[in-house]
């Protein structure tokens, strides 16, 4: 028996196996995926309320700077569904943020008039009560990301994101002013206090707004298995001008991505 005719067959099989292995290697990482993240968000909210005296509004605003420029933070989950093209990735994500709410009360007393002879005086008492809430109800985004393959494990990435956001915010601010006159009757006696005129100004506002905003994403992916990747990322998102409110977030996240 002559084994020579089997050599081309063995050579063909080897080439076919090598080509299949190479193709499998090239296709590694491609396909649909899901990702779950836990994000820490720094939120900056700027409100353009009327100034203390604004003739165009025809009223007095009692909103203090405390509620005009809010800096807060939250921790929230985020889920994504996307497709990996072997370099480029496209994903849709959804997130809900924690509701921010706070209140502030302040009181001040200013002496308006004092009689130097008998010590009688008139004071003005000003009370401010402010209650504010802000809630980024939801964010539905679409991002395009490019992965830089440094080696078989580490893949830094950078990309852009566009998102449709829903925001609710409200403010309830009341300023109450009371003038009080104190009459002294002499040493060892109880003075008489006469409440004077009261004035009260209020500013109330509540909005529910939806707007499309733009942002950027960056991070690094670490392959744990051929299908499982640990993702550490950062994203910046400017939600746009929401009527009289500007809102932007900086987020750091840690999550896992699974490719099917």
Curated annotation (Swiss-Prot):
Region forming the signal peptide: 1-23
Keywords: Cell outer membrane, Membrane, Signal, Transmembrane, Transmembrane beta strand
Pfam family, one: Opacity
An MF annotation (GO) of this entry: porin activity
Main location: membrane
Subcellular location: Cell outer membrane
Disulfide bonds: none
Keyword presence, Membrane: yes
Recorded GO CC terms: cell outer membrane
Role of this protein: Implicated in a number of adherence functions. OPA proteins are implicated in pathogenesis and are subject to phase variation.
Family of this protein: Belongs to the opacity porin family.
Protein name (database record): Opacity protein opA58
Species: Neisseria gonorrhoeae
Name of the coding gene: opaJ
């Amino acid at each position: 028996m002559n084994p020579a005719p089997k050599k081309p067959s063995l050579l063909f099989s080897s080439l076919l196996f090598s080509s299949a292995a190479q193709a499998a290697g090239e296709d590694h990482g491609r396909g649909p995926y899901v990702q779950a993240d836990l994000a820490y968000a720094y939120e900056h909210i700027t409100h353009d309320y009327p100034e203390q005296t604004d003739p165009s509004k025809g009223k007095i605003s009692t909103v203090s700077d405390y509620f005009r420029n809010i800096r807060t933070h939250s921790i929230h989950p985020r889920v994504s569904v996307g497709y990996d093209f072997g370099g480029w990735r496209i994903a849709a994500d959804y997130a809900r943020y924690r509701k921010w709410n706070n209140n502030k009360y302040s009181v001040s007393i200013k002496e308006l008039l004092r009689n130097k002879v008998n010590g009688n005086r008139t004071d003005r008492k000003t009370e401010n009560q402010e209650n504010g809430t802000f809630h980024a109800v939801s964010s539905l985004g679409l991002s395009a990301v490019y992965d830089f393959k440094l080696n078989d494990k580490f893949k830094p990435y950078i990309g852009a994101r566009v998102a449709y956001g829903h925001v609710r915010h409200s403010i309830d601010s009341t300023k109450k002013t009371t003038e009080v006159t104190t009459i002294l009757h002499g040493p060892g006696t109880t003075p008489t206090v006469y409440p004077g005129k009261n004035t009260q100004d209020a500013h109330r506002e509540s909005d529910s707004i939806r707007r499309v905003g733009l942002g950027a994403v960056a991070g690094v992916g670490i392959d744990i298995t051929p299908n499982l990747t640990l993702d550490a990322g950062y994203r910046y998102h400017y939600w746009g001008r929401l009527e009289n409110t500007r809102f932007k977030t900086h987020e750091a996240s840690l999550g896992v991505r699974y490719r099917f």
